[in-house]
Amino acid sequence: MGGISIWQLLIVALIVILLFGTKKLRSLGGDLGGAVKGFKNAMTPEDENKSLDDKEKDQTAATSQQAAEKQPETESKDKQA
């Protein structure tokens, strides 16, 4: 009775999405994820950092490649509207 129900959380989430928009929330999530990765890298020992850096470079390259592939689709949709 005193707690927050799932419906109240959904309504709050909907209001936040309407206020800020999905693009701003997506960029905020990306920034938060980068901060968490940086914190994890700072907390791991140096020898593990080297292998983690290599993995991150691979992930970053794959992510940027996927973003480049999706980029023309969104631009063409914006031009049509």
UniProtKB/Swiss-Prot annotation:
Keywords: Cell inner membrane, Cell membrane, Membrane, Protein transport, Translocation, Transmembrane, Transmembrane helix, Transport. It is found in: Cell inner membrane. GO terms for molecular function: protein transmembrane transporter activity. It comes from the Bacteria. The keyword Secreted does not apply. InterPro entries: TatA/B/E, TatA/E. Residues 47-59, 70-81 have a biased composition (Basic and acidic residues). The keyword Transport applies. One of its GO terms (biological process) is protein transport by the Tat complex. HAMAP family: TatA_E. Belongs to the TatA/E family. This is Sec-independent protein translocase protein TatA. It comes from Shewanella frigidimarina (strain NCIMB 400). The lineage of its organism: Bacteria, Pseudomonadati, Pseudomonadota, Gammaproteobacteria, Alteromonadales.
